[in-house]
Amino acid sequence: MHLADPTRLLASVNADPEFRLAARYWNATLSLESPSRALRVEIADGRVATCRESAAGRPATITVVASDDGWAQFLAPMPRPFYQDLLGGCVQHHGFQVAGDILSLSAYYQASARLFAVMRALRAASEEAS
């Protein structure tokens, strides 16, 4: 599943004031993986430095793995119950797996939630354009 256009995601997240505030001082690599693809987001000093398609299973600070259907539900413009929040719903009820530096994820959870909100908005815009 195509999670997001890397170029548009990089530009949109870096232009988002809420993300910039929540992510200040954050240094991490996120690997967002489905069975067919992975999206690698590298964050340096609170800004997305690079965003690109990648092979799954590469080392990252935080790795989130889900089925294609799970990602589609999670990134829907209005996610149904228990798909609105990564840890509160998806991990407990829908088989998402989160691995890596959980303390970093916890400290910057609002930034990661904002990243996913931007991904939802981009996905909705691309679906409307199709």
Mark where each language-model region is:
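Feature captures hydrophobic
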Residues: 1-130
